[in-house]
């Protein structure tokens, strides 16, 4: 009897100690916020959304903004670049330098993909919050706009790409998704942006507006691969007519004014990245350090 009592007491003591240790090991961190805690407060989500602009802007710094256009009829390198940079030359000439080891190709992906993931987290968080519905609505529009932009550019290069949706992680995983799925997300992101974004901001010209969202939605309808069944020029036309009818935008009288570093955010601009002409806070264009706006 005593032996069994001793065994029972020992087992009970072990169970209590194990439970106590378990409780101790599961103490919430006090020096940092968990993602769940971040998602609870809209004040914690807004910096994540605003950081998306910085991430997207980083994709365009220096020569980065030119790389996706090399090999098209929009840009062409000079002989110096062709001689001095094999990786860069391959982007323009489609020669042996355009291969899986190209740092230029990998940088196009690596500069954008982390921001896609961050945007997906912000979208998930804003879908959960019940605080300040109007503010959350605008931030949702901004996060969707940036994710749509990034996925648009990545799919133009790689076609089938992964889709990050925090509500469908088990279903979608991390692998490439069919083109139709990819472009449904791109188009739906821009539709959300058109429904949620304001026409302007008081003193923050770098933020996405409803005009920019309509422009990108129109571009997405035109650019969607035919096999997706989503290409629709009639819908694109309606998007662009909506912009015209807003009465906020018009063409400049002098085309050259678009490229003046001291003339940012003109009445022709729908969405601009705020660069200046001083290295390293600049964007290269034809080997000049000038202000480049990237109107959609």
Residue ranges of each PLM-predicted region?
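Hydrophobic core
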Residues: 13-16
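C-terminal motif of bacterial Sec signal peptides marking the signal peptidase cleavage site
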Residues: 18-20
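Short coil/turn linking the two alpha-helices of tandem helical-hairpin repeats
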Residues: 155-156, 162, 201, 223-230
């Amino acid at each position: 009897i005593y032996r069994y009592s001793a065994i029972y007491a020992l087992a009970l003591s072990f169970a209590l100690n194990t439970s106590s240790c378990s409780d101790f090991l599961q103490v919430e961190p006090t020096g940092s916020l968990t993602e769940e805690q971040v998602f609870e407060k809209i004040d914690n989500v807004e910096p994540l959304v605003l950081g998306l602009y910085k991430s997207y802007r980083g994709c365009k710094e220096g020569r980065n903004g030119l790389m996706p256009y090399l090999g098209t009829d929009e840009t062409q390198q000079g002989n110096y670049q062709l001689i001095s940079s094999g990786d860069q030359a391959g982007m323009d000439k489609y020669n042996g330098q355009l291969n899986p080891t190209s740092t230029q190709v990998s940088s196009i992906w690596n500069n954008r993909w982390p921001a896609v993931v961050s945007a997906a987290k912000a979208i998930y968080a804003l879908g959960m919050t019940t605080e300040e519905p109007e503010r959350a609505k605008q931030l949702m529009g901004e996060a969707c706009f940036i994710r749509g932009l990034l996925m648009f550019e990545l799919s133009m290069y790689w076609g089938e790409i992964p889709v990050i949706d925090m509500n469908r992680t088990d279903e979608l995983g991390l692998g490439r998704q069919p083109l139709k799925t990819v472009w449904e997300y791109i188009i739906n992101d821009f539709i959300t942006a058109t429904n949620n974004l304001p026409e302007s901001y008081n003193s923050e010209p770098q933020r996405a507006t409803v005009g920019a969202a309509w422009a990108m939605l129109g571009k997405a309808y035109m650019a969607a691969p035919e096999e997706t069944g989503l290409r629709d020029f009639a819908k694109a036309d309606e998007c662009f007519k909506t912009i015209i009818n807003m009465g906020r935008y018009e063409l400049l009288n002098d085309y050259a004014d678009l490229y003046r570093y001291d003339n940012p955010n003109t009445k022709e601009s729908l969405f601009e990245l705020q660069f200046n002409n001083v290295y390293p806070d600049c964007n290269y264009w034809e080997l000049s350090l000038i202000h480049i706006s990237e109107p959609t």
